[in-house]
Structures are given as structure tokens and as C-alpha cells.
Amino acid sequence: MDNKLEKMKELVEELNQYAYEYYVLDNPSISDKEYDLKYDELVILEKKTEVTLPYSPTQRVGDKILGEFSKYTHKGRLWSLDKAQNMEQLIEWHNRNLKVIEQYNSMSEDKLPELRYIVTKKFDGLTVNCTYDENGILIKSATRGTGIIGEDITAQIKTIKTVPLKIKNNHIIEVHGEAIMTKTAFEEYNKAAQVPLKNLRNGAAGALRNLDIKETARRNLSAFFYDVGYNEGSEFKNYREMMNFIRNMGLPQDKYIKECTNMEEVEKEIEYIESIREELDYDIDGAVIVVDDIKTREILGYTIKFPKWAIAYKFEAKEITTRLLDVEWNVGRSGRVTPTALLEPVELGGVTVKRATLNNMDDIKRKNVKLGAKVLVRRSNDVIPEIMGVAEESLEESKEIQAPDRCPYCNSHLVQNGVHYYCENTLSCKPQMVKSIVHFASREAMNIAGFSEKTAEQLFEKLDIKSIADLYKIKKEELLTLEKFKDKKSQNLINAIQNSKNCDLASFIYALGIPNVGKKTANDLVMKFKTLESIKNTTIEQLVEVPDVGEIVAKSIYDFFEDEKIISNIEELLNLGVKPYYEEERIDENPFMDKTIVVTGSLNNYSRGEIKDKLQSLGAKVSSSVSKNTDYVLVGEKPGSKYEKAIELGVKVINEEEFSNKIK
């Protein structure tokens, strides 16, 4: 038995190496026939021993249908990227980076290096996260999902022959990549498919979101990896070092990786990538530009959605012509009435387009858009398509688009304000009230569990809810009269509404629906002004001092709290028991408060993310590099060069046991 197991291990190692040479390096060292003979020998041994190694190439064969997708919590967050539509926006991003670095260097002896960027292609596929354990074995693969929680697609990823099932690494890591379908694989699949695929991206996404693993395998996906999102091993100094690590682990990586020292070089590389776009065997939709130095990334930081040290440059979208059939007028949460174009269905960028934005009547007139005309439609950055203009020859049989004078929902007279039309019937205009209630109850706002748009519609139509404050007056017996509301569901909603009364101030500010104020801005307002009363009474001059708040947003906030109806509504909420609170985090006195600490090596009781959170909760600043300004270096097993640097500089070194004793 032992001899057979040893032979199996030998065959698995050989076959995985041959697969890497064939699929990743495109440089096979043996013939297909030799490979097949070794593969068949492995299959026979696995049947005889009833043992299959977790990284055996036989595990790539899709021969099962899964019941459902389970959730997976990523160890490290998968961030989205901010987008630049043109070089002006890209240069603005670059200038913001320069400003932060200059400010940091002027205040710190530990200077940041000159700004360098790495430019890569932006693949148009599906983002995936692969987790390898301390033995180097692929143990989990997942979709991006929310960035924090994704769906387990381990079985699907194992069908991708370029993704190694085992790597030579002895620490837990998560690597991020893009699963793609090549044009070659797309054409081969469609030759035999009963229902042909429409585009490469849907081909890849559909394969990974398919519970039939055989179907996933048939699509013959590929992948490129470009980021280490979680790492319990030695830290990287820069992105080039990270990319070298990814390549040395045998993970497939695109060969195009360019280092740039200025924006002229970045622009040149973007132009080059766009010039070869059509020649590639896979789809790309732009370029990704990231800061090379890891410490600089830490200083630049993050927004709620994006890292500030990376940006995607999106290529100009493709355009297509179709016919405008009609215009639909919709009412938003603010009462603004906006036109939406109803189009003759057409394929654009892999999506069937039936609707497009028209913005407002001024936009319609400026573009000379008319009913029945052929219009030029552009779809860009996964947002709703936009009408860019009309085909002049189609205007002869077209009709003018008439601006509405009454609300399409409540029939109230509309009021024009600038280029927009508004319905001022805030109390009985259904879409306004319903959308306001849904926003107020949403998870990031008051977090009223079990609340849906259908519920909001019933509250408006059946219970005559005319303001947000009315939510807190609802009685259980009233809910029981609504469709699908039994005793338990009614009581749960009553409980959720009551529980929402104690909410943090930032969530309450966001819930109010102030124009142009998202959750991040709400958080920033609370951090700056501390109380609801202070925010209500602030001036435009004070508001523009808040990070990322310009004059337009400042005026929106100021005007919002000048509205007597809004102030009255807020006061009613407070009188009904809503108690928004703000608590500044209090940190007890401890040896690490206000100290700069560097962590190196593996700790027994903390992952890298956990120790960082723990130190920050103690009021410490966690740094990625050792300098004379470092107060402590916390050392675990197998420390890296940071330990040597600490000894060299005379920085105090402590182990995990000493750390634990100090915080008891």
C-alpha cells in the first residue's frame, strides 16, 4: 500500500508539472500520449487504493451536479476599483496621490519613495478568490460577491486547467484573479452548443455560476492572477515583488506588466493596450493602474468602496444604433421626474439593451432625440445605456417628445426647476414615498429587518403612511390586514421598527435621504460635528471642511436642513423615540497606545488581519516597515527581514507571549 501511495504522489507531482508546462508556459516537455499513459496509471491506482490526493489532476474532471452555492467569507476583502473615463480624471487621481505623499513626507522622517505605478490589462471576466492552505493545497475558491462574502465555486474553479491545485508555499494565502473565456474556447464551445453563448464574459460567468460541473468543464475557462489579498507569510515591499511571488507559485499570470514613473508613460501604456485590444484571444475593457510601493498604499488608504491607490481606466464603450419606441417618465425619491427611453431591443457589449437614459428635456432637445428615430446608444462601465445622438436620415418620420405637465403617478402639476421637472406632492405621490421608506429602512440606514419595496407599497396604499415618522406609529393589528402578513411576520416587523429607534448617528443621517450624501459622507459628517444638532446648524463654510465635501454637496446638506417640513419630520421622529447616538471610541490606557508597531512572522493566536485589528483597538499605529520611529516589533515564528532590521536599529522586539502579558 505504501509503495502505491508513493507512486501516486510521484505521478500527481509529475502530471501537475506537465500541466503547468502545457497550459501556463505553453512549452510541454512530454507528448500528449505520454501524459495520457501516466494519467491512466494514476486513475487505476486511485481505484485500487480508494485514495485520492486533494491536488490530484483527476479532481479537475467535472462529473457531478451540486445542490446549491454555499457562502464563503473572504479572509481579505476584495475591493472594487474606482474608474477614470479619460486622462483628465486619471491625472486628477495622480495629483491626489502626490498631495498625500508630499504631506506625509513633510511630517515624517520615514519618507515614502518616489511614486511609481504598475500598469496591467483589465480583464473582462469574473473576479475569483482562491485560498491555498499552509500545505499549498487549493482549499477554497469563491466569487467576489459583496467583497466580504462570496459564493463557493471551488469545484468549478478546479475545472480550469491553468489553476494549480497545489503550490509550493507554507502559509495560508488568498490570491485574486479573473476567470475568463478565450475567443478560441468560445468558438469551439459554440460549434457544438444547442444554445450558443452570446459573449465571452457571460460564457465565463455562466460557467462558474453553474451547478452542473460538467457544463463548467465544457467551457474550458482560463484565468489570470494579479493580487495577493491575504497573506500569512512574509510581507511584500511592492507590487512587483507580489507579482513575482504569484508567478513563482505557478499561478497563471499575464505577461504584460509595465512599470511607469510618470503619467506620460502611463498614458503611453494605456494607448498601447487599447491598440492591441482586438488582437488578443480574450476580452479586456481597460487598463488597471496601481501604486507599486506597499507602504505608500497604506498611507493613501481606502474609501468605503475603493482603494485610493488603484484605479481602472475604462476604454470607450462600443456604440450601436436602434430605434426609439417611446419615452417613460419616472419619479424618484426626491420627486424629480426623469425620462427613460424605451428602445427596440438590441445587443450591445454582450447585453440586450431595451432602455436608455435621456437625463432631462434639455438633453433631449440638445441631441435632437425624437420618437421613432434611430438613435445611437452607448453602454459604458456597466451603467444604464445612454442615447448619444440620432441618425439624421431617420428624423423625417419621427415625432417630437413632449415634456409632461403632470406627474405620471399622482397627476399633480409638475414644477420646473432648472433643467428638471419635480412633483411636489411628497405626501401622496406613491413612488416618492415608497422609495423614501425603502431607503430609510435599508441595511446601511435604519436597518429595519424584513422590509421590502412590496411592504413599503402596501404601507402606502393600505395603511396611508404619508411620512417616515408614520412608520413608528404602525400597530400590529394594522399589519395583519396586509397581504402575506400573518402573526409572526407582523410581530417581527413591529419589533424591527422598534429596535431601529436606537441607531448610530451616521446611519440616521444617511437614512434621511439628503441629496448627494452617501454613507461615507454621513460618517464623515458625524466624525466632524459629533451631534445631530451641530449638523443641522452648520454653515456651508464649515461643511466644505469635511473630507470630500465640495460646494455642491455642502449646499445640498445646508438646504436640506433649512427646509421646515424636513426639520418638523426629524423632530417628530425624535419625539417618537428615535435616538441617534454617537460614541467616540474610548481606549483604556495600555503600553501600546500611540505606539508604532511592526509585525513579522506567524503568530499562534492571531491571523495577520486579526493582530492588526487588535493593535489598532489598543490605539497603536501598525506599520509595514521598520524604522527608527518604530516603537515595537512583534515577532512570531519564521520572522523575515524586519526582525533583522529591528535588531540592527535597536528597536525593542517582543514575542507573542510578552505581547499577551502586556495587555492583560
Swiss-Prot record:
Signal peptide: none annotated. It catalyses: NAD(+) + (deoxyribonucleotide)n-3'-hydroxyl + 5'-phospho-(deoxyribonucleotide)m = (deoxyribonucleotide)n+m + AMP + beta-nicotinamide D-nucleotide. NAD(+) binds at residues 32-36, 80-81, 144, 178, 314. The keyword Transcription regulation does not apply. The keyword Cell membrane does not apply. Its EC number is 6.5.1.2. Zn(2+) binds at residues 407, 410, 423, 429. The active site is at residue 122. SUPFAM superfamilies: BRCT domain, DNA ligase/mRNA capping enzyme, catalytic domain, Nucleic acid-binding proteins, RuvA domain 2-like. Keywords: DNA damage, DNA repair, DNA replication, Ligase, Magnesium, Manganese, Metal-binding, NAD, Zinc. Residues 587-664 form the BRCT domain. It holds the Pfam family DNA_ligase_OB. SMART domains: BRCT, HhH1, LIGANc. DNA ligase that catalyzes the formation of phosphodiester linkages between 5'-phosphoryl and 3'-hydroxyl groups in double-stranded DNA using NAD as a coenzyme and as the energy source for the reaction. It is essential for DNA replication and repair of damaged DNA. Belongs to the NAD-dependent DNA ligase family. LigA subfamily. This is DNA ligase.
